[in-house]
Amino acid sequence: DPNLKYGGTDIAVIGPPSRDKFLRLNFQSSRGTVSLGLKRENLYVVAYLAMDNANVNRAYYFGTEITSAELTTLLPEATVANQKALEYTEDYQSIEKNAKITEGDKTRKELGLGINLLSTLMDAVNKKARVVKNEARFLLIAIQMTAEAARFRYIQNLVTKNFPNKFNSEDKVIQFQVNWSKISKAIYGDAKNGVFNKDYDFGFGKVRQVKDLQMGLLMYLGTTPNNAADRYRAEL
């Protein structure tokens, strides 16, 4: 919402809740189109659409985040009979467990990031029989390359710098991802003219200038800080 300015900055802010709860992103690869469904209010990925090995459109979704009826509206190519609620939840830990990552610390960091990697994993889930490990790995990379890249210019810049190649992720990327809500609340409730009232440490060193966080998008926390800002300041 261009009218929302948090902490005296020009960082974009997600608009207030509306009747349009979801948005759709379409990706093209050598095997065709794969679509993602995201929640507008926080950019959480709630579903994806791909063809199976019989070229039938199928939609897979997190049942706690979107209903079958909402999914039909968002991804109408898949009939209700061809919708499937995923057996795991939308949090990173659950997806990582199903991705069966055996390297290093066994988290998404070990997979890396990059456009070529995203394209490879799209091809692994499109026009093929469903394999949960491939699906979970696709979701891990797709979430980071869409929602997380929108939230953090730091991640955007890494993608651009290495485009289109795969690159190794890093601890700082993970710390950004798990602290989006906390960072948004700190900027909303405890920053003025782009400067925090105290030093903050979000897992990668102390920060006083908001610009040093290289944010791309903040979560919606209200239109006017006032009492709400006091509440968020107290939480931090």
From Swiss-Prot:
It is an enzyme of class 3 (hydrolase). Coiled coil: none annotated. Keywords: Hydrolase, Plant defense, Protein synthesis inhibitor, Toxin. GO terms for molecular function: rRNA N-glycosylase activity; toxin activity. The active site is at E148. GO terms for biological process: defense response; negative regulation of translation. InterPro entries: Ribosome-inact_prot_sf, Ribosome_inactivat_1/2, Ribosome_inactivat_prot, Ribosome_inactivat_prot_CS, Ribosome_inactivat_prot_sub1, Ribosome_inactivat_prot_sub2. It catalyses: Endohydrolysis of the N-glycosidic bond at one specific adenosine on the 28S rRNA. Its EC number is 3.2.2.22. The keyword Signal does not apply. Ribosome-inactivating protein of type 1, inhibits protein synthesis in animal cells. Useful as immunotoxin for pharmacological applications. Belongs to the ribosome-inactivating protein family. Type 1 RIP subfamily. This is Ribosome-inactivating protein saporin-3.
